[in-house]
């Protein structure tokens, strides 16, 4: 970048010098003597009054001297008429006349404007080329140079000690480390180490971190590049960059080449429709050739990461290229505790902080979520002027990560406050009464994010499957807010829009994907289609009749109506509990899990006066 700035500064300096020379030439080419400029009519009057001593005609321009010694110049519109007028004066000797051929400026002065335009064009072309390359490279034509960043031992090393919650994944990758450290042990047994390792998993699970840890453990050079860095607006650039990347890797073997977000370049090749795909496909073809082209034990291992394995080209996934696929999943409770330990190393924690409790309260959190959680807690503690992070900040950070920051400044009318209170109380009371829902962790009518209020349920353990009864209870819980509005306020609001949408989606999946409908049986309705324009972007197409479609709609409607009636029955039987929770929310605005349990069981809590 500094080299680019130097080049641009030099070009600007030369341009300024060029402009200065051009201006000096223009000034030099003009006469510096003061000459009076008169119009054509005044010139005729002077000649007629015999006040002109001499004139010189150069083209249409007239220069002359008056009898009082004043020099002048003028422009003649019609030379023929002018000569007809002055001829008598010349013949009578009253006027000295001289005619000179018109002489233009030197040829090199005439070329200066054209040269100026050429220089301007070259500068703009250079800037355009630099931008087309994304600013990379110090040479105009360095399109084909790889943008991979090489990390060596001099940089801060990441090891497996910095990775937690992925024990099985580390075991799989340990073989790669062993091969890079002690290749002879494998070669003597005729083993072929995988050429490529594909790390698959949701965003934030630590795929990039694992790749860095492999390089750090093996102590070999690590080339890091994003899939999007290959593709440019010019066809052929991506393929050239792939070649250059592997040329660099061969020079530094044994090494690791890490391609992050490989789906940007490795997307399924289409049928040639839609346009705009040639550059990406050429890049992918070159990548396929390079991965299957270098010799078997050259010591180059390609690690790639993606969260969209479904759209990758099959040729990329076959044995011999990415022949080892490692799924990096969401950590379990033990993994979350280990991750929290890593991210709390440099943070002073208060004695009341229990990372085990935090791990239990964060099911579904990825490693990135947990890092963000610890950072949010540290920011909250700093904002409150604390020297240590307490459990209160961590609890608040969990809620911030899940639902967003509180919006206490938003002013709500009493009517809206009552509506939100009964809506959230309906969710909480129904969740408490259902056998298959997690315990209530927090209920609030303080807006967070895009929600006017929320009821947070926190599972006590990780769940990987859901039964039919659990899904039905989830739908009942989602409809609890709408039912409470209808029962108490005799009106319904738009606040249940997201609840109804989620409930309908669950019911539709129960019928069309999970085969949980007794009437339709264990069948899947609708097939996943592979859109040729988008490169295997998943959609659903109907493979059933209109009659079956109507039956699906009836089944979804039946499930929703049954859940609605069940929620209505539960709230009618426990209407006093609903009123107590709503009153507590109106007065206190927020109830934690312990306070909710007390209110639900008829006990008093601080800050709320029950009649």
From Swiss-Prot:
Pfam families: AAA (PF00004), AAA_lid_3 (PF17862), FtsH_ext (PF06480), Peptidase_M41 (PF01434)
Domain of life: Bacteria
Active site: 424
Ranges per topology, Extracellular: 28-107
Cytoplasmic side: 1-6, 129-611
Cofactor: Zn(2+)
Protein name: ATP-dependent zinc metalloprotease FtsH 1
Organism for this UniProt entry: Thermoanaerobacter sp. (strain X514)
Organism lineage string: Bacteria, Bacillati, Bacillota, Clostridia, Thermoanaerobacterales
Record gene name: ftsH1
């Amino acid at each position: 970048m500094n080299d680019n700035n130097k080049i641009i500064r030099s070009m600007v300096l030369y341009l300024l010098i060029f402009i200065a020379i051009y201006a000096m030439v223009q000034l030099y080419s003009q006469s510096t003597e003061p000459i009076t400029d008169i119009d054509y009519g005044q010139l005729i009057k002077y000649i007629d009054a015999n006040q002109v001593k001499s004139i010189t005609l150069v083209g249409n321009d007239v220069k002359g001297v008056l009898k009082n010694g004043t020099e002048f110049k003028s422009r003649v519109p019609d030379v023929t008429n002018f000569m007809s007028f002055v001829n008598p004066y010349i013949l009578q000797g009253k006027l000295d006349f001289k005619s000179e051929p018109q002489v233009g400026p030197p040829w090199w002065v005439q070329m200066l404007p054209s040269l100026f335009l050429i220089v301007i064009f070259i500068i703009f072309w250079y800037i355009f080329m630099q931008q087309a390359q994304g600013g990379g490279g110090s040479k105009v034509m360095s399109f084909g140079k790889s943008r991979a960043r090489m990390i060596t031992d001099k940089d801060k090393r990441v090891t497996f000690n910095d990775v937690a919650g992925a024990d099985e994944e580390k075991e799989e990758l340990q073989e790669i480390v062993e091969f890079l450290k002690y290749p002879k042990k494998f070669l003597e047994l005729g083993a072929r180490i995988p050429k490529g390792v594909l790390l698959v998993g949701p965003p934030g699970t630590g795929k990039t971190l694992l790749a860095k840890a492999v390089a750090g453990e093996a102590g070999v050079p690590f080339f890091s590049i994003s899939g999007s860095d290959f593709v440019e607006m010019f066809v052929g650039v991506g393929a050239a960059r792939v070649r250059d990347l592997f040329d660099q890797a061969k020079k530094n073997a044994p090494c690791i080449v890490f391609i992050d977000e490989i789906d940007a370049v490795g997307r399924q090749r289409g049928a040639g429709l839609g346009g705009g795909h040639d550059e990406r496909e050429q890049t992918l073809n070159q990548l396929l050739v390079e991965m299957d082209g270098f010799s078997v034990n050259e010591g180059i291992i390609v690690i790639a990461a993606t969260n969209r394995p479904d759209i990758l080209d099959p040729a990329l996934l076959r044995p011999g290229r990415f022949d080892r696929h490692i799924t990096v999943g969401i950590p379990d409770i033990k993994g979350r505790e280990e991750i929290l330990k890593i991210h709390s190393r440099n943070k002073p924690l208060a004695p009341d902080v229990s990372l085990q409790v935090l791990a239990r309260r964060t099911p579904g959190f990825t490693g990135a979520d947990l890092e963000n959680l610890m950072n949010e807690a540290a920011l909250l503690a700093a904002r409150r002027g604390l020297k240590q992070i307490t459990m209160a900040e961590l609890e608040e950070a969990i809620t911030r990560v899940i639902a967003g920051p509180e919006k206490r400044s938003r002013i709500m009318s009493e009517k809206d406050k009552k509506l939100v209170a009964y809506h959230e109380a309906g969710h909480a009371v129904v969740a408490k009464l259902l056998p298959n829902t997690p315990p209530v962790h927090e209920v609030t009518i303080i807006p967070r994010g895009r929600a006017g209020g929320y009821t947070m349920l926190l599972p006590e353990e990780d769940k990987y499957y859901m039964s039919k009864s659990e899904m039905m209870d989830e739908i009942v819980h989602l409809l609890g807010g709408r039912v409470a509005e209808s029962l108490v306020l005799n009106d319904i609001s738009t606040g249940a829009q997201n609840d109804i949408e989620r409930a309908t989606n669950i019911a539709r999946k129960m019928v069309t994907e999970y085969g949980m409908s007794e009437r339709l049986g264990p069948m899947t309705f609708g097939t996943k289609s592979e859109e040729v324009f988008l490169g295997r972007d998943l959609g659903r197409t109907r493979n059933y009749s209109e009659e079956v479609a109507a039956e699906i709609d009836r089944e979804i409607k039946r499930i929703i109506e049954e859940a609605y009636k069940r929620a209505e029955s539960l709230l009618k039987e426990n209407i006093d509990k609903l009123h107590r929770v709503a009153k507590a929310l109106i007065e206190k605005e927020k109830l934690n899990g312990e306070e909710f349990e007390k209110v639900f069981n008829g006990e008093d809590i601080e800050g709320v006066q029950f009649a």
